[in-house]
């Protein structure tokens, strides 16, 4: 069964969503982060909660650590955190604060030896966020281009014991126009590492289609704030 990971994106300790990762598209969510934690925690089908420090991602170092630490105390659900994590000490601080999994992006993409070291130090607890526009990987809060191809890069990761690859199609993110099923399916076939889909998810039918592609988990952003998404789920 595909896992459901609702997302909480933070700017200044406020729950927001961006469209295509553009910081000038910031939209405040109807629920606060605390309210979202309480809401998502009532569902058995929610396997973990996905929290992103958006300013941390842009500034290249964690900004919301103390606030996220306070959110951790509000639920027994597993929590994963990403955004600006660039050092082993930051990872250790999050784990010491009770965070279950850490997501690395830019640092892990630009320094795969460091990624390998972190993955071996914390096996199964490090996830790699790979954000792409089409097949072109972007870094530093999606604001910087790379020369890396999504599929070529992912194939290099096969011997690194990360928990999974969180794949975001930037063109779909925040639009609720449906995931990029074609690229997601190709990515699942290109690697033995679990693939987590993020970006554009609208409703349970999208989740079912992702499940049919053998996607390990789905991160739900804007749709998670709509009661209709949760209808019939326990």
Swiss-Prot record:
So what EC number does this one have?
Answer: 5.3.1.16
Give the subcellular location: Cytoplasm
Q: Name one GO biological process term.
A: L-tryptophan biosynthetic process
Q: Does the keyword field hold Cytoplasm?
A: yes
Reaction(s) the record says it catalyses: 1-(5-phospho-beta-D-ribosyl)-5-[(5-phospho-beta-D-ribosylamino)methylideneamino]imidazole-4-carboxamide = 5-[(5-phospho-1-deoxy-D-ribulos-1-ylimino)methylamino]-1-(5-phospho-beta-D-ribosyl)imidazole-4-carboxamide
- Where does the record place the catalytic residues? 9 (proton acceptor), 131 (proton donor)
Q: Which Gene3D superfamilies does the UniProt record give?
A: Aldolase class I (3.20.20.70)
Q: Where this protein primarily resides, as one coarse class? A: cytoplasm
Asked if Protein biosynthesis is a keyword of the record, the answer is no
What superkingdom heads the lineage?
Answer: Bacteria
User: What EC class does the entry list?
Assistant: isomerase
Coiled-coil segments on the chain, per record: none
**A GO CC annotation given for this chain:** cytoplasm
What GO MF annotations does this protein's record show?
1-(5-phosphoribosyl)-5-[(5-phosphoribosylamino)methylideneamino]imidazole-4-carboxamide isomerase activity
Q: In which pathway does it act?
A: Amino-acid biosynthesis; L-histidine biosynthesis; L-histidine from 5-phospho-alpha-D-ribose 1-diphosphate: step 4/9
Instruction: Give any Pfam family that matches.
Output: His_biosynth
Keyword entries, A-Z: Amino-acid biosynthesis, Cytoplasm, Histidine biosynthesis, Isomerase
Q: Which HAMAP family match?
A: HisA
Regarding protein family, the annotation reads: Belongs to the HisA/HisF family.
Q: Which protein is depicted?
A: 1-(5-phosphoribosyl)-5-[(5-phosphoribosylamino)methylideneamino] imidazole-4-carboxamide isomerase
Query: Gene name, please?
Result: hisA
